[in-house]
């Protein structure tokens, strides 16, 4: 049997392949931008008045030589190295600049909510290194700018990215300020804090004890959730001023107000919280490396994993932003901010709307402007039926046209929903025939191959089913053809869908409304171009569709940029987002990634569907896309989920339960995982581990010893991300030989009960 294509099918496939080429070119451009391919790092012999990534990398090289975890000698050595480098910078400074260096040991206690759990923390003897740089004429009370980075590293990690890059960038920046001869008009405080990984203790100690903390008028927190890539402003505030300064000053702007809508969902936090939210209300920026998350908090976070160009972009940006902050008339001390808040009715903590375009330039507008701008699309959608029929036929059939527009809106919404649902269904179906989840984890392109084609199928189904739009208007009365009226209904329905989403963002007070607003704005331009072509040539053709697509290219390119980065970031983070209990936990990671790719596909392709759907919504194309989806699903099952550059995270703990000062009750190895592939997967593909733990081929969770959540109290509340942790017996002989006495708690005084019924217990901790 010969499979024949009609001329319309041939034209549709030509158009589909043309779109595929367009999106491929856009994806290649976006990949280059996100991975800093267009930024040339300066060499170690670069001019001294320029920030040099190579010089900064040399600092990272020293910092990663030994572990910088709290309690290890490497942390103390890192503090000595940082202080020595700052003293060298002080020696090079001219007579017109004042540099003060201080090593501070902080103690304190506080309560915080982390991952939805309230925890209380007490700490002592944590080290902060502080340098205050100011002009000779400055006063102690002058408002200043704080830039913060932490030099401790997480357990088991060299910490090249997190946060050796932060410390190195700050050291090179401090050197640059001195060697360039720039005298800051306001003081700049460099804080190298030594305890961020332990619930931000160093930043808390600084905010509670530093003598000039009330003089700080703005802060910049530099962080790393990976080894480079986009250095994104993930949080800013309170107020719009910090993001405005960034928009005006950044050389390579990388910021989206939408990030503040997403950041609270991520299981983590930064020192930004201490400065701008919990203990300071300081106008702040939280700037974070986001790519390379595979290595985040692992032993793979090494010097060779750093993405070239990332620190160069960060350094150039930071210098420009520091200059803008120190020159701003809005840089105020804590007392001045409080006085302004009390006396001015115009003082607002409203968040602005801002976004960068491919890190080339940045668009910023206030919340008040957003209220007006983001209301325009819905106003156009509601008024357009009345305006069109008032100009053409009076008031007689405007309601029928509005009904058609609403039908178009509902059908477009159905397409977007199906574009999300279909990939989720396909991801679940694949797992029915596979023994492992997350095959895309080490190979992100597999996720796009698997889920984009089936998402397109969902997007096209409404247009395929309703190839003839169910018009409410009477074609016999109107001077327009049914084809033209259908195109109007499809277009204005889709436009109305994005207008409604824009309004929903606005009402909810979220910062991501610019995403759908830009789609609405460019769709209008495309519609005007399309109609101008039709009026000139009096017929629709493939060229008229191309005329519709061309004005949308800037919008589509941004959608690919934002959406592609979002998917890449999410895929990297799925390896540490936690393990849900079976049976549903096995499907969650694949379902989430499939749903996000469906959303991104709907966002990137959805604006094209009203006009391009005429060529794409054909049964032959639907079948072709389904075949690609099935083939990609089958192909992906042949790939192993992990690799040396995308390792699986396994949490291992040697647990020793003691009583009194010298007796061991129990000794065990506790294992857990933080993604969808269980420990059975680990034992299957890491036979050495199974052998050491005496795990046989007949092992099952039903007969295994489960590790109780209380066992992981040292990692609370991160331990709530674990599921089905296992416990294996361990010998205690080596421990008894090594230690004569163990840490233990004892009462050193009888407990007391207050008049209100609360009990006070007096405990003494002996370290053994």
Name these PLM-found stretches.
Residues 1-9:
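N-terminal Lys/Arg-rich, disordered targeting/topogenic segments
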Residues 15-24, 28-45, 82:
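Hydrophobic alpha-helical membrane-insertion signals
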Residues 34-57, 641-662:
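Alpha-helical transmembrane signal-anchor/signal-peptide segments
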Residues 41-365, 768:
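Soluble extramembrane regions of membrane proteins in the secretory/endomembrane system
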Residues 80-132, 245-248, 658-768:
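Extracytosolic and intramembrane catalytic regions of membrane-associated proteins
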Residues 346-381, 397-405:
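Cytosolic-side membrane-insertion boundary helix
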């Amino acid at each position: 049997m010969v499979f024949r294509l009609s001329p319309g099918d041939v034209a549709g496939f030509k158009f589909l392949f043309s779109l595929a080429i367009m999106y491929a070119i856009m994806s290649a451009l976006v990949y280059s931008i996100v991975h800093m391919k267009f930024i040339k790092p300066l060499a170690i012999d670069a001019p001294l008045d320029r920030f040099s990534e190579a010089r900064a990398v040399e600092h990272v090289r020293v910092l990663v030589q030994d572990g910088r975890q709290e309690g290890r000698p490497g942390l103390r050595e890192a503090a000595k190295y940082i202080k020595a480098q700052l003293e060298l910078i002080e020696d090079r400074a001219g007579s017109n600049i004042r540099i003060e260096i201080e090593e501070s040991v902080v103690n304190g206690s506080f309560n915080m909510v982390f991952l939805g759990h309230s925890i209380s923390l007490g700490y002592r003897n944590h080290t902060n290194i502080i340098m205050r740089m100011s002009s000779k004429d400055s006063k102690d009370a002058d408002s200043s700018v704080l830039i913060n980075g932490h030099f401790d590293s997480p357990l088991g990690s060299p910490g090249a990215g997190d946060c050796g890059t932060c410390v190195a960038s700050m050291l090179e920046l401090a050197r640059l300020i001195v060697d360039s001869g720039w005298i800051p008009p306001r003081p700049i405080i460099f804080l190298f804090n030594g305890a961020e990984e332990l619930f931000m203790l160093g930043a808390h100690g600084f905010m509670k004890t530093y003598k000039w903390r009330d003089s700080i008028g703005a802060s910049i927190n530099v962080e790393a959730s990976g080894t480079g890539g986009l250095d994104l402003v993930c949080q800013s505030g309170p107020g719009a001023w910090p993001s405005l300064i960034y928009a005006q000053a950044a050389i390579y702007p990388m910021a989206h107000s939408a990030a503040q809508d997403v950041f609270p969902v991520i299981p983590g936090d930064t020192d930004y919280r201490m400065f701008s939210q919990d203990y300071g209300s300081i106008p702040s920026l939280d700037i974070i490396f986001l790519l390379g998350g595979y290595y985040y908090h692992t032993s793979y976070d090494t010097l060779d994993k750093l993405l070239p160009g990332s620190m160069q972009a960060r350094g150039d940006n930071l210098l420009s932003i520091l200059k803008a902050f120190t020159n701003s008339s809005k840089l105020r001390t804590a007392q001045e901010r409080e006085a302004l808040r009390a006396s001015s009715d115009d003082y607002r903590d409203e968040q602005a709307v801002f976004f960068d375009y491919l890190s080339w330039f940045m668009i910023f507008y206030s919340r008040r402007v957003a209220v007006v701008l983001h209301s325009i699309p819905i106003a156009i959608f509601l008024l357009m039926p009345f305006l069109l029929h008032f100009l053409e036929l009076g008031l007689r059939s405007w309601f029928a046209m509005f009904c058609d527009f609403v039908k178009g809106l509902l059908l477009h919404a159905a397409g977007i929903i199906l574009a999300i649902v279909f990939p989720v269904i396909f991801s679940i179906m694949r797992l029915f025939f596979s023994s492992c989840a997350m095959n895309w984890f080490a190979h992100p392109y597999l996720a796009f191959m698997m889920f984009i084609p089936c998402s397109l199928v969902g997007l096209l189904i409404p247009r395929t089913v309703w190839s003839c739009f169910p018009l409410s208007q009477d074609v016999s009365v109107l001077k327009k053809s049914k084809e033209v009226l259908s195109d109007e209904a499809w277009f204005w329905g889709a436009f109305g869908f994005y207008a409604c989403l824009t309004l929903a963002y606005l009402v909810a007070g979220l910062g991501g409304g610019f995403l759908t607003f830009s789609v609405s704005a460019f769709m209008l331009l495309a519609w005007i171009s399309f109609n101008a072509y039709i009026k000139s040539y009096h017929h629709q053709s493939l060229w008229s569709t191309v005329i519709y697509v061309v004005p949308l290219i800037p919008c589509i390119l941004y959608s690919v940029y934002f959406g592609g980065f979002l998917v890449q970031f999410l895929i990297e983070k799925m390896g540490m987002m936690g393990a849900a209990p079976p049976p549903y936990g096995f499907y969650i990671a694949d379902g989430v990634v499939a749903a996000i790719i469906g959303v991104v596909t709907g966002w990137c392709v959805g604006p094209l569907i009203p006009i391009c759907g005429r060529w794409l919504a054909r049964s032959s194309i639907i079948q072709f896309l389904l075949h690609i989806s099935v083939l990609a699903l089958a192909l992906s099952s042949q790939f192993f989920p992990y690799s040396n550059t995308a390792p699986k995270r396994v949490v291992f703990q040697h647990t020793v339960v003691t009583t009194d000062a010298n007796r061991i009750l129990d000794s065990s190895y506790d294992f857990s995982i933080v993604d969808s592939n269980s420990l059975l997967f680990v034992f299957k593909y890491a036979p050495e581990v199974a052998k050491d733990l005496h795990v046989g081929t007949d092992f099952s969770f039903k007969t295994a010893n489960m590790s109780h959540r209380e066992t992981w109290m040292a990692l609370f509340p991160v331990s709530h991300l674990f599921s089905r942790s296992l416990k294996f017996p361990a010998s205690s002989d080596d421990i008894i030989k090594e230690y004569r006495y163990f840490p233990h708690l004892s009462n050193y005084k009888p407990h007391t009960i207050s008049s209100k019924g609360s009990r006070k217990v007096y405990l003494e901790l002996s370290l053994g």
